Structures are given as C-alpha cells and as structure tokens.
From Swiss-Prot:
Disulfide bonds: none
Key words of the record: ATP-binding, Ligase, Magnesium, Metal-binding, Nucleotide-binding, Tricarboxylic acid cycle
Catalysis performed (reactions): succinate + ATP + CoA = succinyl-CoA + ADP + phosphate; GTP + succinate + CoA = succinyl-CoA + GDP + phosphate
Cofactor: Mg(2+)
The keyword Aminoacyl-tRNA synthetase is assigned to this record: no
Residues the record lists as binding substrate: 274, 331-333
Function: Succinyl-CoA synthetase functions in the citric acid cycle (TCA), coupling the hydrolysis of succinyl-CoA to the synthesis of either ATP or GTP and thus represents the only step of substrate-level phosphorylation in the TCA. The beta subunit provides nucleotide specificity of the enzyme and binds the substrate succinate, while the binding sites for coenzyme A and phosphate are found in the alpha subunit.
Protein's name according to its UniProt entry: Succinate--CoA ligase [ADP-forming] subunit beta
EC number: 6.2.1.5
Functional pathway: Carbohydrate metabolism; tricarboxylic acid cycle; succinate from succinyl-CoA (ligase route): step 1/1
One Gene Ontology cellular component annotation held by this UniProt entry: succinate-CoA ligase complex
Amino acid sequence: MNIHEYQAKRLLHEYGAPVANGVAVYSVEQAEKWAKKLPGPLYVVKSQIHAGGRGKGNFKELDSDAKGGVRLAKSVEEVVANVKEMLGKTLVTKQTGPEGKQVNRLYIEDGANIERELYLSLLIDRTTGRVAFVVSTEGGMDIETVAAETPEKICTLSIDPAEGVTDADCVKLCDELNLSGNAREDGEKLFPILYKAFCEKDMSLLEINPLIVMDDGRLRVLDAKVSFDNNALFRHPDILGLRDISEEDPKEIEASKHDLAYIALDGMIGCMVNGAGLAMATMDIIKLYGAEPANFLDVGGGASKEKVTHAFKIITADPNVKGILVNIFGGIMRCDVIAEGVIAAVKEVGLKVPLVVRLEGTNVEQGKAIINDSGLNVISANDLDDAAQKIVAAVKGA
C-alpha cells in the first residue's frame, strides 16, 4: 500500500526525522489560510498523487509550456495562483501513463536553500534477507538512471537485524554520502530513526529523493515515498487509515474483494493463471512471441467457479484487452472446475475477444471436454508454448 508524500513526511516526523513545515490542502481557501501561517518567503506547492516525476509532469488541461506538478512560490499570492491552476487538474507523468491522475490535494511547505541533493532509501535486500540502505550522492534524479550509467555512485549496506544500525553503519553511510559537520551529525541521528520506522511500520520501501544538505549544513527530508507490506496491514490500523482508494486502480480494488492477485499492465493480452510463478512465465512467453500482457492475475490454488467469473469480469473491464489467455495447472485446483468457471464467465460477460485456454493436471480431460462441448468460440491449447502462439496470432489477426 502506498501513501501520499505529506502522509509519509508526517509519519517520519513522528519518529524524529527532519522535515519542513507543511500542510495538505483541498481548496484555494485552505491554501491561502495555511500559507499565511508558514514563515516563507519561499514556498513549495506539490501535487499529491501516487506517482513519481511530478515536477517534470504536465497538466492535460493547461498549455504545454505551463509549469509542472511541483512549483516554487515567493509569496502567498503566488501560492494561491498556483493552487487555482493545479487543483482538480489531471497531471501526466512518466509513471501515470497518458491518462494521468487527477490532483485532488496539494501539499504546501516551506522552501529550502539547497546546497546538495542526496539519495537514500531502505528496502528489503532479497539476497541477504535483510533491510538495506541504498545511498548515493546523485540525489534528485531517477536512481535507475544512476544505476545504469554510474553504478559506482550507489552504495548498498545491509543491516544486521540482531544489532540494528550500529555506529559503524552510520560512519559508512556518512562517508558514502560525503557528509561532514552538521550534516554528518544529523545523518548519524537520522539513519537509526529511518531504520526503526521501516521495521516498526512494516514498510516495503522508504525512499527519500532527495535528502538535502541545506545552506546551514543541516539535513532535511525534501521528498518521501513510502510503501507498506499489504500482508502486514492488519497490524497497523493507523496506517490502513491513510489509504487513498481514489489513487488505486479500480480493477485492483475489485480483485482484492475476491481474493484475486491482480496488477494492471500496459499490454493487450489478458492473463488468468494460478500461481505467481506460472503467471510470470506466462507473461514472459507472451512477450517472447511479440505481444505484451495486459495484467498479472493469479486466481490462487483454490479458485471456485464464481471466483473465475469475477476474474474474467475484471480482465474484460480493461478496454485495452484484445484477447485472453487462461493458463491453469490443476494441482489443488481441478481443471473441470476451472473449465466450468470459464464457460460460465464467457456466457455472463458476453466475451467479444479471442480466448485461448490451456489446462493441465487434475481432471484435465474432463476440463477439456467441458470446453470442447460448450459450443463456444474457445481456442484450446496443448501446452504453454502452443497457447502463447495461438493467442498472439489471434490478437494480431483481429
């Protein structure tokens, strides 16, 4: 689960991290009221959406030369003018896709005189099974670009869970970030704070980009992105209360209601598979044959006929889907049950796009017979390779 920047900063502030004074606003009147209470003279007006690249984004409703989703203002009047222009508009960034996201709230905070921009994040290091810091002196830009072009400028430090962040870890991180004086002192305090917040709140990602050194030598969290482990949210009702459903894909919300693991993608071939590994393999082979998957959808190991029907409804709700591939290995799940669900779903949704079904495992012959005897336009496949080729051919021939 993701939260907004202002929520992330509020959470980090509760742990003692240095963040600027700021307030989230939902109207022009609120913006004017609260901007007057900030010291100024420099303000930052930030669009609050669950996507990166806001500063370089553009608003659909504004001219192409208009400013992006993060703006500087040098007076309360400028703050108000920017809020009027940004609030309620659709911001398009490299992460939103061409449809963009509507800006329903803005975050107004004190500006800062920046000397240096750094990168810092915490995540789960899958290699060591530990929480790791990832730091770089190249802050304020896309870390993937840094990793691709100058990987030597990125340092990863895994933390021993039995000891936590030690003095030696702090020294290492400060050295990698070239911190000295007040900034080094702040860093030695900040690193344990961030680690504590990450672990106690069951985060999956804590990214600060940039972490800045100000002209007085002090550190400040200038931007913050936080994601939480969905499987641990039952332990954190306070965090669950921060969820903004309007920022989530409606199809993913609907899928979660039926215990379906669904992630929307940008392709045109819908996938319904049981098991995450098989789902990944299915998406890979679709790409191998020259097409793109429209989604990841794992129906799990004990899907019922009703669950399969819901899965079809979710897949077909995506207007980009031009064909569907069902790939099921029946272990716990029986192929005849899946076949019945597929037939029921095709009839209920009135499927208009090509459908390829590959079944293997428990009761596979019964499952194939159900599909073949249905009289519906369903293409049967013998194996995964055959299935991928058939759905790609069907979509490209449509």
